[in-house]
Amino acid sequence: MAIVSSKSPDPAERRSQAKTKPSVSEPQDSLVRPQAAPEESQRPEDQIRPQRLADYIGQPELKDVLGIAIAAAKSRQESLDHLLLYGPPGLGKTTMALVLATEMGVQCRITTAPALERPRDIVGLLVNLQPGDVLFIDEIHRLPKVTEEILYPAMEDFRLDITIGKGQSARTRSITLQPFTLVGATTQIGALTSPLRDRFGLVQRLRFYEVEALTDIVQRTARLLNTPLDQAGAEEIAKRSRGTPRIANRLLRRVRDYAAVKAPGPITGAIAATALELYNVDPCGLDWTDRRLLSHLIENFGGGPVGLETLAAATGEDAQTVEEVYEPYLLQIGYLQRTPRGRVATPAAWRHLGYEPPQASGQLTLQQLLTEPET
C-alpha cells in the first residue's frame, strides 16, 4: 500500500500538483496535547502505525463495523463506501484510513481541508485517483464551500461537474472519475453541513482509550523502537496519556530519552514515573497549564462558578484555547463542570491539587447552578 501525502503549502507545488499546591514553575512545551507535533510525522522511527486491522489496538466496535464493510466490498469487488470518522484528536483516524487502504490493496492519498483552498486543488486529487483508492481528508469540517460542492457529485456519482468560462458563454463539462473511497476525519462533526455529512455511507465515532488498551499500544511501540519496557512501566505511561494513543507514544519517547541518559536498562514503573514528573505530567495526565487553570479557579474564585472569559483572563489564556484545548480533558475526568453560571471545580479537582473541598452547605445548589445564567 502506497501512502501519498498531498499538501499544497506554496503555489509552485500546486502547479506540479497542530494540600499540595500546584507547581508554579514555568512549563515546557506540553507533552499531553493531542495535536500532532511536526516531528511526529517526519522521523523514520516514528512510523509505528499498524498496517492491518488485526494489528489496530482498541476501538472494537469500529473494527467490527469496518471489518464487515471491507469483507463485503471485497466480495463484490467494489470500493468501500465513503467513511466519516469523528472524535477527539490523536485517537487514530488517520491510522484507520491507512489500514483501510492496506486491507483493500489500494493507495491512500492524504490531505487536509485547509490545503484545498481552490477548486483545482481537489480536482487535481480526484482525477488522479486509481480505482478503489482511498482519499483521506483531515479536518474535513474546514473545507471551503466551493470545494465541498465539487465533492457532492464526486461522492455520489463519481463525476466531476466543471464550469468553463463565465457569463453567457459558460458551459459545464462532466468528467467521469474512477470509483474511490473518501475518508473524512473531524473533531467537530456538528460543523459539517448536512449535504456533506449525508453523503457518507458510514459514520463512526472514535472514543477515548481505556488504560488497558493504551498499555498494549505502549508495549507494541516499545517493541518497534527496540526499547526494553516492563509491564509496570507501560501502565505508568498509559495512565498519564489522557486516553489518547498519540500522547502515549509521545510520552514513551520522552521516557525512553530519560532512561537512556539517567537510568540505562529496562524502563520500570518507577523510572517512567520519575521521568514524567520531570516533564510536568502528573499521575492523572495533567500538565502545568491544566493544574494552573484549576488552581486559579479554586484559589481566586472559590472553585466557581466563574465565566469562561473571566477564567481565561485570570490565567492569561485565550478563551477559545481554554474551551477547546484545556477543558475537554478536565471535563472528561470529572475535574471541571460547565454550568449556565460558569465553570466549577469539582471536589475531585480540589482533592487532586491538595485542597480541602468546601462543605456542601456553603455551596450553591445544583438547581441554582443549572438555572442561573453565566456571568
Curated annotation (Swiss-Prot):
Residues 1-50 are annotated as: Disordered. HAMAP family: DNA_HJ_migration_RuvB. Disulfide bonds: none annotated. It is found in: Cytoplasm. Keywords: ATP-binding, Cytoplasm, DNA damage, DNA recombination, DNA repair, DNA-binding, Hydrolase, Nucleotide-binding. Its EC number is 3.6.4.-. ATP binds at I48, R49, G90, K93, T94, T95, E156, D157, F158, R199, Y209, R246. Its main location: cytoplasm. Has 3 domains, the large (RuvB-L) and small ATPase (RuvB-S) domains and the C-terminal head (RuvB-H) domain. The head domain binds DNA, while the ATPase domains jointly bind ATP, ADP or are empty depending on the state of the subunit in the translocation cycle. During a single DNA translocation step the structure of each domain remains the same, but their relative positions change. Residues 210-280 are annotated as: Small ATPAse domain (RuvB-S). Residues 40-49 have a biased composition (Basic and acidic residues). The RuvA-RuvB-RuvC complex processes Holliday junction (HJ) DNA during genetic recombination and DNA repair, while the RuvA-RuvB complex plays an important role in the rescue of blocked DNA replication forks via replication fork reversal (RFR). RuvA specifically binds to HJ cruciform DNA, conferring on it an open structure. The RuvB hexamer acts as an ATP-dependent pump, pulling dsDNA into and through the RuvAB complex. RuvB forms 2 homohexamers on either side of HJ DNA bound by 1 or 2 RuvA tetramers; 4 subunits per hexamer contact DNA at a time. PANTHER family: HOLLIDAY JUNCTION BRANCH MIGRATION COMPLEX SUBUNIT RUVB, PTHR42848. This is Holliday junction branch migration complex subunit RuvB.
